[in-house]
Each structure stands twice: as structure tokens, then as C-alpha cells.
């Protein structure tokens, strides 16, 4: 049975892990969200989220965005290659409802997979 949990091993935790992604990333982006990714040595993808206060003012809105992105990653983790992924959120994300945001992030996961799998 395939596990769809979102454990600590599936997250980027330290500044060094984030910095490794920022040095030489492959990008997949839309107007509201950018994904930066680099291959990792793990056997699974890992994700880190940045939702700046400057772009998304209220804490409950930042939490909503992060929750939707984490849930989307959790459901697509087995479709993604072994990558370290940083999700950058821009201002326009506040205009999206949860289903629209989920659909957008799903599309970006597929785009990123195609770039690494050929």
C-alpha cells in the first residue's frame, strides 16, 4: 500500500537545504507561484514553502495557502522525481480560491516532472 503521509523527511528544514535549491534551480512558474527544484540524493522529493508576509498579509491566509500546497504535494509525492523543491508564493495567490489554487499547483507539479523526466 502506498503511503501518502507528509513526514519530516519530506520537508526542507534548514537554511542550507533551501540555499542548495536557490543556487542552480530548474523553474516551473505561473503568475502566482514559482517552483524551484534541484535533484537530491534521497529516494523521494522534499518540499519547502515560502509565503512572505509582504505578499500575503494575514496569518490565516498564509496558513491556508501553505495547507493547500502541502496537501497537493502529499497527494503527488509519488509522481515526482527525487527533487528538492522550494515553492515561492506571489501576491496574486490571494485572488485564488482553494480549488483553483489546488488545480494550479497540480499543474506546476506535472510541469516540473516533465522537465526532469524528459
Swiss-Prot record:
The record's SUPFAM superfamilies line, in alphabetical order, gives: Ribosomal protein S5 domain 2-like
- List the InterPro entries: Ribosomal_Su5_D2-typ_SF, Ribsml_uS5_D2-typ_fold_subgr, RNase_P, RNase_P_CS
Is the Cytoplasm keyword given for this protein? no
Identify which top EC class this enzyme belongs to.
hydrolase
The reply on keyword RNA-binding is yes
E.C. designation(s) = 3.1.26.5
Recite the UniProt keywords alphabetically: Endonuclease, Hydrolase, Nuclease, RNA-binding, tRNA processing
Reaction(s) catalysed by this chain, per the record, are: Endonucleolytic cleavage of RNA, removing 5'-extranucleotides from tRNA precursor
Give the GO terms filed under biological process for this record: tRNA 5'-leader removal
Sections of the chain in a coiled coil: none
Q: Which GO terms describe its molecular function?
A: 3'-tRNA processing endoribonuclease activity; ribonuclease P activity; tRNA binding
UniProt-listed Pfam families: Ribonuclease_P (PF00825)
Q: Which PANTHER family match?
A: RIBONUCLEASE P PROTEIN COMPONENT (PTHR33992:SF1)
Similarity annotation: Belongs to the RnpA family.
Query: NCBIfam families under this entry?
Result: rnpA
Q: State the function annotated in the UniProt record.
A: RNaseP catalyzes the removal of the 5'-leader sequence from pre-tRNA to produce the mature 5'-terminus. It can also cleave other RNA substrates such as 4.5S RNA. The protein component plays an auxiliary but essential role in vivo by binding to the 5'-leader sequence and broadening the substrate specificity of the ribozyme.
Put simply, this protein is called Ribonuclease P protein component
- Species the sequence originates in: Shewanella amazonensis (strain ATCC BAA-1098 / SB2B)
Question: Corresponding gene?
Answer: rnpA
